[in-house]
A protein has these predicted regions:
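N-terminal helix-turn-helix DNA-binding core of bacterial DNA-binding proteins
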Residues: 9-15, 20-49, 55, 71-81
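Amphipathic alpha-helical dimerization/coiled-coil segments
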Residues: 1-5, 9, 78-103
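Short, intrinsically disordered/low-complexity patches at protein termini
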Residues: 48-50, 59-60, 87-89
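Charged, low-complexity, helix/coiled-coil-prone segments
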Residues: 1-4, 13-14, 68
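Single-residue recognition of alpha-helix boundary sites
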Residues: 33, 64, 86-88
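Beta-hairpin "wing" of winged helix-turn-helix
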Residues: 59-68, 75
Length: 103
């Protein structure tokens, strides 16, 4: 990778996921869309903390949100994530991929 812009974008994505709870959120969203309350219960983390981490992931365009009634549900952004097989989800960084294995 010699393009400084591409390197900067990649570093920003890696920085956004470089926190254990954010990795756990990504893992939870791998199975489908969820709202903040659902994620907080699954992760046993305070809602305010989940909201903060979702904000960071949303800012990096790793997750997307959609209003459904009274709730906002979050899902993985297909621009960065893909399921090429049933065995794993991949975060595509352009020059490399990070594998999130299915449990």
């Amino acid at each position: 990778m010699t393009d400084p812009k591409q390197a900067k974008e990649c570093a920003e994505l890696l920085q956004a996921i470089a926190e254990p709870n954010r990795i756990r959120i990504i893992e939870c969203l791998r199975t489908g869309s969820k709202n903040v309350t659902e994620l907080a219960k699954l992760l046993n983390v305070e809602i305010v903390n989940v909201s903060h981490h979702l904000g960071v992931l949303r800012q990096a365009q790793l997750v997307q949100d959609e209003k459904q009634g009274r709730f906002v549900v979050y899902s993985l952004n297909p621009k960065h994530f893909n399921n090429e097989s049933t065995k794993a989800t991949f975060l595509d960084l352009g020059w490399c991929r990070i594998e999130i294995p299915h449990n």
